[in-house]
Each structure stands twice: as C-alpha cells, then as structure tokens.
Amino acid sequence: MTSRSREFFYEGIADRFEGLDHPADVRRRLEVVFAECLAQTPLAGQRVLDAGCGYGLFSAAAVERGAKVVSLDIGTRLVARATARAGSHGVVADACQLGLRDGCFDVVISSEMLEHTAAPAGAVAELARVLKVDGLLVLTTPNRVWQGTVRAASRLRLRPFRGRESFVGWGRLERACAAAGLDVLAHFGFHPWPFQLGLERAARVVEPRLARGPAAWLMVNQAVVARKPR
C-alpha cells in the first residue's frame, strides 16, 4: 500500500468500519472515556472536539450528555457518517493540522486516532492548542509494546485493518503531553491482553488490579487525561 492509501484507509472502509470494529473494545473505550476519564466533568453546554471521530460513536455519546460537538476526521465519508449519527457539526481535517482557532474547546476527546497520524507528538500539540485554558484532553491509544504483535497479526491477515499504525510508548506519550504544555492528571492502562481473545469477563476482573499499578505500561491500550494549565 502507498503512504496515501494507508493514511486514508479508514475513509475507504467508512461504510463498513463499524462492523469491523470489535464490540468489546468499543464498549470498553466508551466506558474509559465517559464513565472514568470524564466521570466528574459535566459535558452539558461544553464545546467538545471528537478528533478522529470515525463512525461517530463518541460524538453521539457526547451529544447525549448535552455537549456541543465537533466531529473531526481526515475523510469526508467518515465525517458524514459521524454527523448523521450524532447530529454534530463536522470538520474534515488532518489531526496534525486542524485548521481551527486556538482555545476553542472545553474538552477534546480522541480515541484510537493518535496512532494513525504521521506525527503523533505533533497531533498532541494540535489538540492541546485548540483547548481552552483549564480544558481537558482525554485520549486513548494503543501501547507501543504491542506494536510487533499487532503487525504480525496484520501480516497473517488476522485483523482487517491496513491503515497507518505507529503506536506510541507510555513514556513518549507523557513527554508529548508535557511538550504540548499539558499537565497529565491521569495515565492508566486498559485491556490486559488482546480483546480479540474473547475473555472480556476475565479482563474486567484483572484490569482494575493492573491499570494504575507498576505493570500498567504493559497493557494493550493506554488512556491519558491532561489539563491545559493557566
């Protein structure tokens, strides 16, 4: 595949993207973002950016909570699906160059988008730029320690996704947040093993014991909550 075809891979599968996503992963990420990271943050009336909106589940969840949502992705078909689902405002843009004014969002949500960008640290800086002072960035992304396993699964055609994937390491993600001027409030792991194994019930027992402990950096995915300081 060419670099461009990898960049726009998810745009090419926009009509079937949701059916290819794993339900257990989607459920857990929605919980992580809304029930955990934003549990103490009322969204009613808040301006929220869903960066890497995909087919719109996170946009819809934010709208349901009363937020004024902008759904952003790199492809027009993805944005169209997200806005149709959520009733949100759509923007087509690269996360590394948003084209939005500084300080215009109270909350920025980005779930499993960062790894698909050409420059993850640059994308974090852009997400931070459009945050208001005291605004929150809530981000989930795969952990780099699992990159080799995922690439092997892709080569063996065990997973349906062929887009650009550059996983970010635990420490690198914290450094990217710091370089963007953000204060990291929470950084934890989720999915103790690949969700494709179908051991969701067992994962829910094991995960709380590992998510914020010394082994958190070994988990499949990671979540960050960061604030833009005054």
Please place each PLM-identified region on the residue numbering.
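S-adenosyl-L-methionine-dependent methyltransferase catalytic module, highlighting the catalytic core
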Residues: G19-V26, E36, L57, R81, ...
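Conserved N-terminal segment of class I S-adenosyl-L-methionine
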Residues: M1-Q97, V107, S111, V124, ...
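A structural micro-motif
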Residues: A67, S88, G135, L182-D183
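Residues lining the SAM
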Residues: S111-L114, T140
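Acidic/polar helix N-cap motif
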Residues: D94-Q97, R101-D102, A119
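A generic structural signal for secondary-structure junctions
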Residues: A14-D15, G87, G103, R151-R157
